[in-house]
C-alpha cells in the first residue's frame, strides 16, 4: 500500500509503472480513479499490471483487448487462486488424506504458493482483489466497487482467533 499510493505521482511525472501489486488496482476507488486519470497525461505513461491476476497468463491483456475491440464481456470464469487449488487438492479427507489443513497451508507457504501472508488467501481477500481488478477492466463495472475488494462478499477459512494475526509466521 505504501508504494501503490505513489503510482499516480509517478505517472504524472511521466514514469511508467510495472507491478504485480494487486493492492493498487483493487483498493479504494479514489486510488484506482487517480491511476486511471494519470494514465491520460500528455506523456502517456504506461501501466503494466498483467501479473496481478493469473500470474504469468495474459488474462488482463486479453480482457483489455476484448473490450478495446468492442466485445461485450458477459462473464469471466476461472480458478482465481492457485493457492486454494493446491490446498484443496492436497486436503482431501474423502480420499483418505490424514494431513492437517494447517500443515498443508504451511507447506504451501514454504513452497511459495501463498501470498506473503497466507491469511490473504484463506480469508478470501486475494480472490476478492482479483475479482475487483477484473471488474474494473469491464465498462459498466469499473466503478461499481467503491470500497474496492472490501465491496466483495467473502467467507473466510481462517479461525476467528487468527483472523487479526499480522505476523505470518505466527499465523501458520
Tell me what each language-model feature is.
Residues 99, 103-172:
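Substrate-binding/catalytic subdomain of NAD(P)-dependent oxidoreductase enzymes
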Residues 2-13, 22-50, 55-66:
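Rossmann-fold NAD(P)-binding glycine/threonine-rich loop
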Amino acid at each position: 500500500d505504501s508504494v501503490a499510493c505513489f503510482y499516480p505521482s509517478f505517472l504524472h511525472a511521466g514514469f511508467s509503472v510495472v507491478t504485480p501489486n494487486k493492492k493498487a488496482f483493487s483498493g479504494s476507488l479514489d486510488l484506482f480513479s487517480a491511476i486511471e486519470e494519470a494514465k491520460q497525461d500528455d506523456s502517456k505513461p504506461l501501466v503494466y499490471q498483467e501479473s496481478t491476476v493469473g500470474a504469468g497468463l495474459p488474462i488482463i491483456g486479453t480482457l483489455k483487448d476484448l473490450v478495446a475491440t468492442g466485445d461485450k464481456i458477459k462473464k469471466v470464469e476461472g480458478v482465481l487462486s492457485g493457492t486454494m487449488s493446491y490446498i484443496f487438492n492436497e486436503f482431501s479427507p474423502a480420499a483418505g488424506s490424514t494431513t492437517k489443513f494447517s500443515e498443508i497451508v504451511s507447506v504451501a507457504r514454504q513452497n511459495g504458493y501463498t501470498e506473503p501472508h497466507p491469511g490473504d488467501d484463506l480469508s478470501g481477500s486475494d480472490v476478492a482483489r482479483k475479482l475487483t481488478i477484473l471488474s474494473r477492466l469491464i465498462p459498466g463495472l469499473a466503478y461499481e466497487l467503491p470500497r474496492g475488494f472490501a465491496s466483495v462478499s467473502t467467507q473466510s477459512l481462517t479461525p476467528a482467533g487468527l483472523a487479526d494475526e499480522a505476523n505470518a509466521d505466527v499465523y501458520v
